[in-house]
Amino acid sequence: MTDQISHLGKTLSTAASVLIGSQDIEKNVENNLLSNSPRNPYRKTLQESLTAADFMNHETFDKLRKTRAIASTLSEDSKGLYSQRSREKYFTNKVSDKKTTFKVLSHLSDDLLKDLPETAESKSNTRDQGETKLLKESDSTDASQERIFSLYQGFEASIPVINRSVEKEHLLLEQNNQESAAQILPQMGNKPRIRSGPWEDLLESKEDTYISLDFNPERISNIKSKKELERINELANNNLVMLDIRKKLSADEIDEIKKQIQDLQLKQNLLVKKIAAIEENELFLEDIIRLIGHRSADFSNDTQIEFDQAKSLSGLNNPESMIDATRPTALERKNSIDIVETSLNEIRTSFDGSKQSIEGKDNHNALNGFFEDASNKKSRKAQPTVQKYYNSGKKLSTIPKAHDDAITCLDFDPHFSTLCTAGYMDHIVKLWDYTKKRQIGAMEGHVATISCMQVDKNYNMVATGSKDATVKLWNANDVIGRYEEGNNSEALHTLDAHLDEVSSLYIDGANLMTASQDKTIRRWDLYSGKCIQVFDVNFPSLSAYKSSFMKSNEDSMILKTVNTPIIGSIQSFDAALATGTKDGLIRLWDMRTGEVVRVLEGHMDAITSLKFDATTIISGSLDGTIRLWDLRSNNLTDIISYEKPISSLDFDAKHIVVASNEHNTHIYDRNDGNKWDLQDEEQDTTSLFVKYKERYTMEGRSNGDIGIWIV
């Protein structure tokens, strides 16, 4: 707004300096619009506008509106001025004579002259003489100073380019009448002009580099005339000046474009923040709607209980009918005694085993209740999209000291902004709202380090595996509610069939796959909590294998593990199961038969990470390589090498995210093969574990920090 007012003031100043200062108009003072008469309303209004301290007040605008009729006439004549084609008619109008019109249109006020750029010489003259000297074509400046060119020189430098473009267009039109454009354009050395965008001609054209004279060094060497050499020298200098001016014009355009880009970037950042705030409010409202649904269900249950109580009370009001209905006969009394004695005998014989079965039934009922409760199924009406608008490599935030020691594993749900993390020493799984960097839950129950976890994408369930040989299933909603109340959470169900540390797990629909150091893989039915299949991985190669990995990094989470996991990673889909083991082999299983159907060989050390999609399986190993395999042909398609052992990886169709016990998390672009890092100058620790979903990357570091990035 300030710039607009400034420009308006300069415009009024320019017009008024002509209208007020003109001395050549003395006829018809009352009626002439450009008259100096103080009774002229237009002149009087302009004079007041320029001299008043508050020229933008309402009174001035009212006076301007009163002269609307005169201004309308001027507007019509102005349209006539700009519509004339001949030079003479350009200065012909109904308001004034040609001489006056020429003065008005060609006049430059002092304010406009002061805006012209000054050279060092003109600045010194201004200081000495108090006036501004304009840069002329013959002026020269010191080579160490940037040359500043006048507007006239800019026009003059553009004329050869414009003339050449016009000549080319005329040539095209003339030849187009004789032949087809497809035959003409190749002869001219140009491609057919297919306009796909406003900048295509600018990118392909070289007209701005055009030199008006063909300077042939061989021809210059053969010139015998000094005058001819001086003429060519002058032309060359002129062309050099013109090229310099064109270069300066192009540089000015670049600066202007940069400024526009900065402004657009600032606007984009503000809009992204606005979208992020909107999505937070959307998630909050969905939580409110979910809470209302829970309360409505509670009201329905309370109503049913009240109905049952009222029905029972109505029966108590008629005690005689109750006595008659409940009085047993002699035969019924005898049968009841026999039934009681039989039941007592059964209880005595099975009492020892009943204690063990009660807990299992309770867990089974808890699982059934969890999956039958519709509130535990994940659903969102509005999906988050803000991550699409961030630039790749942007660090969103850091959760400092999420745990006191190194992060062993983590997982997150980008649709609900929830993050689960585990540390090496605290044996607690923490639940976070990662957008606010706030802890919202804690899962306590394991008695050893948590080595693996997964957040179910369909239900509010978290599965965790530990070195205590157990797998625990948690209700995330219950965990959050108990944490807000200040109470400890309890696991929804515990799977304790493994005999040694659980090293990896994977949830696939209703199935849960778990791998252990006891050399077995178990398949569980999540709805019942029962083990339905066991895979034996006690292969001879695993027993004889010894890792060649050298202990060289004290911060490495891998080195804190006494033994390399026998089964480093697993993943399943439908009836297919993939396992990566410490002998460096990838085995593909058919779960319908329980047999290995393929073996992929290539890694020279233990496999720590593994994941596959419809066509590709990607594995990371302690040998410092990532290998990509084509599942359709079983062929190795690519090898990506790093300096240190791979501790974790994740990928999608575009990128592979890698943690290799180094300072930065690595990114590999699957489309162009480029490698780049998530640069974090504030951190001096190592990246140990990564998860990558929908452009979000979560990295767990050796000091317990969690980094949140966009890839």
Curated annotation (Swiss-Prot):
Regions annotated as coiled coil: 224-281
Name the record gives this protein: Mitochondrial division protein 1
PROSITE patterns (alphabetical): WD_REPEATS_1, WD_REPEATS_2, WD_REPEATS_REGION
PANTHER family for this protein: WD REPEAT DOMAIN 5B, WD40 REPEAT PROTEIN
Membrane topology (UniProt): Peripheral membrane protein
Principal location: mitochondrion
UniProtKB keywords: Coiled coil, Membrane, Mitochondrion, Mitochondrion outer membrane, Repeat, WD repeat
CDD domains per record: Mdv1_N, WD40
Organism: Candida glabrata (strain ATCC 2001 / BCRC 20586 / JCM 3761 / NBRC 0622 / NRRL Y-65 / CBS 138) (Yeast)
Chain's role: Involved in mitochondrial fission. Has a partially redundant function to CAF4 in acting as an adapter protein required to form mitochondrial fission complexes. Formation of these complexes is required to promote constriction and fission of the mitochondrial compartment at a late step in mitochondrial division.
